[in-house]
Amino acid sequence: MQILKSSDYKLYSKFIENLANKLTRFYYSKLNKPFKVSNKLKSGYDPVTTADKAFEKFIRNEINKKFPNHQVIGEEFGSKKSKSDYSWIIDPIDGTRSFVIGNPTWSNLISLNYKGTPIIGLANFPILRKFYFNTSSDFSYVSENGKKRRILVNQKATYSSMKLSAAFHGSLSLKKQKKIPQILKRMQFPCSDALSYSHLAEGKLDVV
């Protein structure tokens, strides 16, 4: 479903594509070095790094330069209030735990919403040098090493043939623990942060 005019989609799509490339360059020029880690929680563990904050500041600055009236909501620095119909939702590093241990599956996640409805989404993977892009007009592609390729979900998967990716988070009740062996039989692939969901959109996985 197309929510915006074609010219608006082109404007925001070009901005986000350029931002993806800028984020990868920013990582290699400024953030590919030792960093500090702190815990957001008094009880439990929810890590945040100096790189999380640096990425979010960079993204906010790029948005504010181009669209100063838009609302911006980020994981690390909260919300910038605005009366605009447009809002940007930022997760500067999705997969901070992976980032901390050097796993390359972490990403920069950005969504542009119009009147509360997502219209454009970006998942950028700097280490893998690729990004996934989607619009509400049903156009999706992956850009890898500068080459774009259209992507589609696998609509022919069956229960017996499906490729399932999963992970367990938090504590599980005894009743739920008893169901784990049933899930493990189908769990052929580990869950790799937003990359697993990107692979779902690409048709490489069927269930996440």
Report residues per predicted region.
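N-terminal subdomain of lithium-sensitive/metallo-dependent phosphomonoesterases centered on the IMPase/IPPase/PAP
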Residues: 1-93
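Residue-level signal for inorganic ion chemistry
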Residues: 23-27, 52, 63, 96, ...
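Short secondary-structure junctions
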Residues: 32-40, 140, 183-190
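Generic detector of well-ordered alpha-helical packing
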Residues: 53, 76, 92-95, 126, ...
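DPxDG-like acidic metal-binding loop motif
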Residues: 82-141
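Short helix-loop capping/hinge motifs at secondary-structure junctions, enriched
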Residues: 138-148, 172
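An extended, acidic
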Residues: 153-208
